[in-house]
């Protein structure tokens, strides 16, 4: 299934350290040559300060069991530099500990003023940012987050390093699996990017990177399944970035919609986008939805669902969703089939769901028992009779709000572009006589 593996593409938009979990995940699969994969990991880790990880990778490649002199010397240099940086920031960190329990920590401006007044602190000489970066390169992500948090408190959003700190903080929180904090940092970074004075190309690049990083957060946070749909499908700027720069992200958006039963209203909009982008990107997951909701090809959907399982099993981002995806995909096939045939035989249904008749009957009974399906089973005839299942007022309201929100953002974007064009034209006109 190397044809459907997105690791190579995804790694292009991730920080070097964020690629290591993906690469290690692939080592447990049989998609690529293990020797070549380990050699690539070694090449990548050599660009960091993670000497122990480098040595471990060398052992896995059977290069040597003892650390080469070059690595011994490099490790000593890394530790010396780390100690020097820690000594440089020690006075400020000590002052921060003293001020933590006081009133000044309640407000960042007051906190910075207290540091400047009592400890002669200058934001321009912020060594903590360099220490945080160095700790991060050493793989000490937890300690790095503490210094990055301090930087965000004392830095102005106009600081030249502020954006780098935002990216670093998000990466470190992801790598320490702090999903709640990572989501907060993701939201803060997105707001900064959306409101920054970037050129069109710069904004597109920043959003493309953020989209890839956010997938790691969304599929690990309890609220992520709703948030990924809202951001990728209903925020025009991000949907445009996906369509322009990374249509392969459709896999993750489609997966989120399939496993999110409360957002079935998003299916119609998702299918439109899948059809629009089908000439640039297709995989078994998007093709499954096309078979089911565009072509009503139930046999094709059944075959694609089998392929989807292999794709998900080998995708680091969504492997944890495998069982849920299969369950919800079967339910989607069932619901769609029942819209066309109000009364169906269990044997026919079992064939469409790739299940044995007794398994299919038990599966339907559980759906009815858990109040997820309005239907009745006639055991004598072996029939399933569907009842009507109207859309709840809440879902209707959510659908209308999403639609209005998307249209509002689209109009706001048009107005902003026209305003910029007008300003540029006025600026050009004012210079035409010179």
Swiss-Prot record:
Keyword Transcription attached: no
SUPFAM superfamilies: Winged helix' DNA-binding domain
Gene Ontology biological-process entries: formation of cytoplasmic translation initiation complex
Gene Ontology molecular function: any one: translation initiation factor activity
Alphabetical keyword list: Cytoplasm, Initiation factor, Protein biosynthesis
Keyword Protease on entry: no
GO CC annotation: eukaryotic 43S preinitiation complex; eukaryotic 48S preinitiation complex; eukaryotic translation initiation factor 3 complex, eIF3e; intracellular membrane-bounded organelle
Residue span, PCI domain: 218-391
Location(s) in or outside the cell: Cytoplasm
Pfam family, any one: PCI
Protein family according to the UniProt entry: Belongs to the eIF-3 subunit E family.
Its job: Component of the eukaryotic translation initiation factor 3 (eIF-3) complex, which is involved in protein synthesis of a specialized repertoire of mRNAs and, together with other initiation factors, stimulates binding of mRNA and methionyl-tRNAi to the 40S ribosome. The eIF-3 complex specifically targets and initiates translation of a subset of mRNAs involved in cell proliferation.
Subunit structure: Component of the eukaryotic translation initiation factor 3 (eIF-3) complex. The eIF-3 complex interacts with pix. Interacts with mxt.
Protein name: Eukaryotic translation initiation factor 3 subunit E
Gene source species: Drosophila sechellia
Gene this protein is translated from: eIF3-S6
